[in-house]
Amino acid sequence: MKKTMVVLAHPNMENSAVNKKWIEELQKCSDKILIHDLHKEYPNCIFNVDKEHELLENVDNVIFQFPLYWYSSPPILKKWLDDVLLYGWAYGDDEMANYKMKDKKIGLAVTVGGPEESYSKNGSIGFSMDEVLIPFKATIKYIGGIELPSFIFYDAVPETGDAKINESAKKYSDYILNL
C-alpha cells in the first residue's frame, strides 16, 4: 500500500472533538499513514524545509487536514505552503523537469463549524465549499498534483454528538486507506 502523509494544521487539538478523533482513528494505521502535526513539530512556525521536502518525497499521497478559519486554513498551513512548496522543487518553468509534487495525489480534510446548507449560492455564506477551497485546488493544480475529492465535516461544534464524530472518523480513515 502507498504511504499517505496527513499534514495536520490545527492550532488547538486539545479542544478539538472532530480533528482529534480523526487523528486517533488514523493512528491505528501508522504503518500506512504518517501524521505530521505542524503545531507540535514547529511551535514557532520555523520550518525545516529540507526535512519537509524529504517527508514529501517519501509519500505518494498528501492530505491537508485543518479546521476552516475565515474561509481559509489556519495561518501555519499557509506559511508551510509558502515556505515548503518552493520554485524549482515543487514547480517551475521547465515542463520536462521532475518536480517533486508532480502527480502526487493531494486532498483536503476540512472541519467546518457551520451547516452544509450555508455553503451554497443561496446559503448564508453565498458560496459552495468547492468555491471556498479554490485557492487550495489552484495550488494543487499549479504544482502538478492530482486533486482528490475533499473530505468535509460540517457542524463541527461542541454540541456535535459522539456517534456522528465516530462515524466520520471511520469514513475518514477509509477515505485515506482507499487512496
Which residues fall in each region the model found?
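Helix-loop-strand module that forms the ligand-binding subsite of alpha/beta enzymes
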Residues: D50-K137
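A short beta-strand-loop structural module common to alpha/beta enzyme folds
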Residues: K32-C45
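N-terminal beta1-alpha1 ligand-phosphate binding loop
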Residues: M1-K32, K171-S173
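Short histidine/acidic/glycine/proline-rich micro-motifs that form metal-
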Residues: P11-M13, K40-P43, G126, D155-E159
